[in-house]
Amino acid sequence: MMPNRRWLIVPLLIVLGGCEPSGLPATPLFVGVEGHSYAQGSELIQGRLSARFPTGSSVRELKGYLEQQGLQIEPTGRSSTPNSGVAFFKYNGPVCGSQVRVSWEADAAGTVKSIHALYGDTGCP
């Protein structure tokens, strides 16, 4: 009976390890981020976004850029704050992996008030 249980582990490992990309997208926003600490990576991404989208920039352009860089925009209904949004990218497995989250706040006219980038782990159970 024990030898048969080993075969159950193989599909489980494939499912857990094969569902997410293995690294950050090869796009300008993420150049040089991997290999740094999460804090340093967050600073790199934050600096690039702040330089490209200073206060008063178009949220529509920010969203388009984030999608071009490989992030997914969360549906607006999921945000608890009006005129805010979140984009994300997760990789290296659904259980214990890494992620980039970019959140922003906008004014009623649809211009950026603030942007916050976080590069970190997804947390392990």
Question: Which stretches of residues belong to each language-model region?
Answer:
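A cross-family detector of function-defining hotspots
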Residues: 63-103
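Hydrophobic helical h-region of N-terminal Sec-dependent signal peptides
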Residues: 9-13
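Amphipathic N-proximal alpha-helical interface segments
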Residues: 89-123
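C-terminal motif of bacterial Sec signal peptides marking the signal peptidase cleavage site
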Residues: 15-18
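Terminal, regulation- and interaction-focused segments at domain boundaries
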Residues: 29-61, 69
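Bacterial N-terminal signal peptides that target proteins for export
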Residues: 1-8
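Bacterial signal peptide processing site
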Residues: 20-23
